Structures are given as structure tokens and as C-alpha cells.
Amino acid sequence: MAAVQLCRTVENVTVFGTASASKHEALKENGVTHPIDYHTTDYVDEIKKISPKGVDIVMDPLGGSDTAKGYNLLKPMGKVVTYGMANLLTGPKRNLMALARTWWNQFSVTALQLLQANRAVCGFHLGYLDGEVELVSGVVARLLALYNQGHIKPHIDSVWPFEKVADAMKQMQEKKNVGKVLLVPGPEKEN
């Protein structure tokens, strides 16, 4: 949702979003132009139907073979930003076969291929920017400005007392949340 809201700050932007059909209404409300049910539809084919020349940016939280799919959707001068490896997490337990399959199918491209295709690939991991205080502070300041102007607003799915951390985690593992799941310290409050 956060990435979608940031995309909305760009004038005349078209946003494709993949999610279960039950989450499509929330996606539309937050700025997704074309929600695609990845359970029933090949999102690559659907995007190519709507945007035959490709897309400018692919935000990839999945990794593995999906990074290659995203790369192949790019227009010339397009960019893939990979920021996660959700394909490694296939259920409540670690699955070594899924991990091996994702590693084996990971995207790889040479500098020459990037040059010839006029495309770019980059990664983002906030955890590795701990020494970049000035850079991160500047980004946070811009995000706060967008928030104060009403352009972005965190989407909170649910709030859980810390004692129910297992229930909150289960909700996320079962992909039932649309937005952030928050844990709050202190005892559960009576309604």
C-alpha cells in the first residue's frame, strides 16, 4: 500500500497491483488502477494486454523467477526495484525446497544485457543503510512532508496487544491482512 500511495504522487500514473481478489477493493481505494488476481490470472499477460509497450517501473517484493518476469515487462529505460524475497516464505514453516527453487531461479543479468536492453535493476534494503544517516533522514523528511500534505497515509489493517503476537503473525502468514499489522505494548483493553 505504501508503494502504491507513493506512485499516486506521480501525475498521470497507471498502477498495476497483484493481490487476491478479496483485496482488490482496498487496492483500488489506495490508487491501484488495474488490480490483478495472481491466483487466477497470469499477471504478465494481463499487463501486456493493457500496456503492450511495457511499464516504466516494477516494484518487486517477491524475488526469484518473478524478478525476471518484472524485468521482461520493462519499457526501454525502465527499472526494476527489488526490495524483498517473499517467494522464500511459502507457509508457516521454512521450506528448504522452496528456498532452493527460489535461489536456483533467481534473476541474473549481465551489464552487457542491461546496456543492450536500456534497462536498469536495483535493490533496496533499509537495513543496509544504517550508516547513511543523512540520506535516510532526507528521505524520512520527504515522506513526512507527503504525509502532512495528505498525499500518503499509512494503511493499518489491525492492532493487536503484544500478548496476541502469535495471532497477529498468523494473520500475516495466512495473507489475511491488507495493510500493516501493529503490535502495541501493555495488557489487552476491554471494550
Where in this protein do the model-derived segments appear?
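C-terminal capping/lid region of NAD(P)-dependent oxidoreductase domains
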Residues: 144-145, 149-159, 166-191
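Glycine-rich phosphate-binding loop and adjacent beta-alpha segment
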Residues: 12, 65-151, 186-191
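Short amphipathic alpha-helix with an adjacent loop that forms part of the alpha/beta core around
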Residues: 42-53
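Local beta-strand N-terminus motif with an aromatic residue
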Residues: 32, 53-56, 165
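Short, well-ordered alpha-helical microsegments
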Residues: 24, 44, 65-68, 166
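Short conserved AdoMet
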Residues: 8, 52, 74-75, 116, ...
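N-terminal Rossmann-like NAD(P) cofactor-binding module of classical short-chain dehydrogenase/reductase
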Residues: 36, 56-59, 81
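Mid-domain Rossmann-like dinucleotide-binding core that forms the NAD(H)/NADP(H) cofactor-binding site
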Residues: 1-41
